[in-house]
């Protein structure tokens, strides 16, 4: 009898406690997404009737929304004889867009003497991409960074009275000549011609980053690969820059000039891109400002990455503040540090598990384009005279 009484009391106490509990409700409603169309001066068609368009949220190919999965492969850093098999493997791995840098300093080691043969045969590489239906984004510089000497500005140019990455007419004349050479190599291979080239990146991290002299030459200033008026904004690597850029108009003018010169030399693609992170210069409504996420940056000391947390990345891009209205452009994270350069004092190893987590976090945060930088490894070649 006592056992029954104790059991009844215990049940009554449990029921009273249960009903007395405060019930909380968690709600995380998604903000209704407004998709803008028609404001971006980009898009194009090919001879077979295909078309590419872009709105404020995503890219469409032949009228269907797509998520570009970009895999970076620098052809000049890998043997020509193996290019084709590597392109095929990348496609089998799920890559549907291949971006590649055109490193000025490798193609014009001596002033006026351009090399487009052997492992530097740009045209052959793009033709192989066409053969295997691999869309391409050409990153034409002139400054590339790309973890290469001078950001790929040729050594000989520093012996001339030029202000690199500036609006100086002399510097721009050298860039114009470079673009002319690139344009001739790519003739007939653009999307409008039935070729694989769907995009073109202009410059790299304009008014944000310079080639990492501070890494390669410890103690040296950061003023060798940046315009004289932008020295105060030169950083070694990708980072947050929240100070006001007082020379912003000069940077934006420079980007517009580069686009105009590229088009004059025949480099005409459905869309153009510019690295938009860290308050860098962009071309409003005329180029997609792509973003990045480096979880193992060699230019910083090891620390917890901020890129483990989900957020509305379309509204607040990584490495904000930025110099554009993020919600009027699609979020394409073009440089996700799935691979990274090693230096003597910092040798990060990016595991496949870490790269996968970064991709899931970025897509889950609302990005509609991801880019593995790097997807394919390689080694920077020595100078021909070495």
Per-range role (PLM):
Residues 144-186:
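Active-site-adjacent "subsite" loops/lids of carbohydrate-active enzymes
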Residues 21-97, 127:
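N-terminal carbohydrate-binding accessory modules
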Residues 63, 90, 98, 129, ...:
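Conserved, mostly hydrophobic/aromatic
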Residues 252, 257-273, 302-385:
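Catalytic-core region of carbohydrate-active enzymes that cleave or remodel glycosidic bonds
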Residues 83-151, 155-156, 259, 263:
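Aromatic-lined substrate-binding rim segments of carbohydrate-active enzymes
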Residues 174-273, 277:
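Active-site neighborhood of glycoside hydrolase catalytic domains
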Residues 1-22:
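Bacterial Sec-dependent N-terminal signal peptides
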Residues 67, 94-96, 130-136, 191-198, ...:
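Short, well-ordered coil/turn segments that N-cap beta-strands
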